[in-house]
């Protein structure tokens, strides 16, 4: 059976502000199944942003588990991510999930990979998904050469990724913490 795939999620942190955004396209093979999916959300009393890429059902399963870890560790983003990664590596069912997450709170941004790794991105910029490389390159160039806000950088990066990646559209959801 073919997998649902393709999206772009990008996060930019600058100073005391962070923005996390994603497109809305869900693709099954070469068919666009939905154009307005919401892959970026606020969780834990609106204090944590999370964006997901990969298999849709897998991503929702990981998101649910991450939220449970966040509750268990009273909003400690790093601890919740590390605990989820431990489970991911040791649980046979979790190891089969094909998804990635970007999480961010007021102080920290983390990427949780499909291998169960937790990465702290360099320079406060990270992106995942099929258009992630385009978005990350654009975000990095904009961050280094402009005074745009994180939200503006995320918006422009997603626009560029949507122009270049066939699995990324121009329906964007962007959340910020300031």
Curated annotation (Swiss-Prot):
- Gene3D superfamilies reported for this sequence: Glutamine Phosphoribosylpyrophosphate, subunit 1, domain 1
Q: Which InterPro entries has this protein been placed in?
A: ATP-dep_Prtase_HsIV_su, Ntn_hydrolases_N, Proteasome_sua/b, Proteasome_suB-type
Which positions in this protein are listed as binding Na(+)? 162, 165, 168
The cellular location(s) given in this protein's UniProt record come to: Cytoplasm
Q: Which reaction does it catalyse?
A: ATP-dependent cleavage of peptide bonds with broad specificity
The alphabetical list of record keywords is:
Allosteric enzyme, Cytoplasm, Hydrolase, Metal-binding, Protease, Sodium, Threonine protease
Q: What is its EC number?
A: 3.4.25.2
Q: Which domain of life is it from?
A: Bacteria
PROSITE patterns, per database record: PROTEASOME_BETA_2
Q: Where is the active site?
A: 7
The record's family statement is: Belongs to the peptidase T1B family. HslV subfamily.
What is this protein's name?
ATP-dependent protease subunit HslV
Which species? Answer: Burkholderia multivorans (strain ATCC 17616 / 249)
């Amino acid at each position: 059976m073919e997998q649902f795939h393709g999206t772009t999620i990008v996060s930019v942190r600058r100073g005391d502000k962070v923005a996390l955004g994603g497109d809305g396209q869900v693709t099954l093979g070469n068919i666009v199944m939905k154009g307005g999916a919401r892959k970026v959300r606020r969780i834990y009393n609106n204090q944590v942003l999370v964006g997901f890429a990969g298999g849709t059902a897998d991503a929702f399963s990981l998101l649910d588990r991450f939220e449970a870890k966040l509750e268990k560790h009273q909003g400690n983003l790093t601890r919740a991510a590390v605990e989820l990664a431990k489970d991911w590596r040791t649980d046979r069912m979790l190891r089969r999930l094909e998804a990635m997450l970007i999480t961010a709170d007021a102080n920290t941004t983390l990427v949780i990979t499909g291998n169960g790794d937790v990465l702290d991105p360099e320079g406060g910029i990270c992106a995942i998904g099929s258009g992630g490389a385009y978005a990350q390159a654009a975000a990095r160039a904009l961050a280094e050469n402009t005074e745009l806000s994180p939200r503006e950088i995320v918006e422009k990066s997603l626009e560029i990724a949507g122009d270049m990646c066939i699995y990324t559209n121009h329906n964007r959801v962007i959340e910020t913490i300031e």
